[in-house]
Amino acid sequence: MVWKPLAHTAACLAGAFLLGGLIGFERQFRHRLAGLRTNTLVAVGAATFVVFSSLVSGDSSPTRVAAQIVSGIGFLGAGIIFKEGFNVRGLNTAATLWCSAAVGVLCGAGLISHAAVATVFIIAVNALLRPLVQVLEFQAMRRGAFQPTYAIDIICHGDAEAQVRALLLRDIGDHLHIHELESSNIEGTNRVEVSATVRADQRQDRLLEQIVGHLSLEPRITSARWRIEDDSGGLSGL
């Protein structure tokens, strides 16, 4: 009597191990944060919780356990997602972990064939759609959608830092995409340098000149200039 449920558990966990490993192998091959071991552990862990709910009598519905697994994976995925400037990285890796948990839930419920089908689709999304994304990005660049990067440097009195940042954000508005905004004290003075890196859908030299020209009229700003980041000979405004 003991061997039958034990064999069922072993089969479920083995399925989660193999399928989670397949998903993780693709991630490991591309050197992602969550690779072979992480995706395999997520799948096996999710399967274990579902198997446990089916073995214990009482108020332990597998569907309820699956809902709790989804919540738990959310916390794990949040640790992988991070911001780099104004860019968010790790979203695809976190989504893959979420899918690995779903595969584990299916395996834990004994639906290994269904889990195998889901695994095929998950790997296909990560592997086959990547070239399509690259083609779309290349086509966008050919259409002139390359985004030039501009740097704006402003020096102001220390007590005007917050005002300058607010004015800069207001003038940028929806015309440019902010990539980075930071402030630093200039040693030995009461001045602060506010630096911003922005991107545009196309060359916006005239707009940058207008923004910097408007800011230079502020009495608490002592210097304002802009330049094109990827062009050492780019224009600058005082």
Curated annotation (Swiss-Prot):
The chain crosses the membrane at residues 5-25, 38-58, 66-86, 105-125. InterPro entries: MgtC-like_C (IPR048640), MgtC/SapB/SrpB/YhiD_fam (IPR003416), MgtC_SapB_SrpB_YhiD_N (IPR049177). Virulence factor required for growth in low Mg(2+) medium and for intramacrophage survival. May be involved in regulating membrane potential by activating Na(+)/K(+)-ATPase. Gene3D superfamilies: 3.30.70.260. This is Protein MgtC. It is found in: Cell inner membrane. One of its GO terms (cellular component) is plasma membrane. Its main location: membrane. It is a multi-pass membrane protein. Keywords: Cell inner membrane, Cell membrane, Membrane, Transmembrane, Transmembrane helix, Virulence. Belongs to the MgtC/SapB family. It comes from Brucella abortus (strain 2308). Pfam families: MgtC, MgtC_SapB_C.
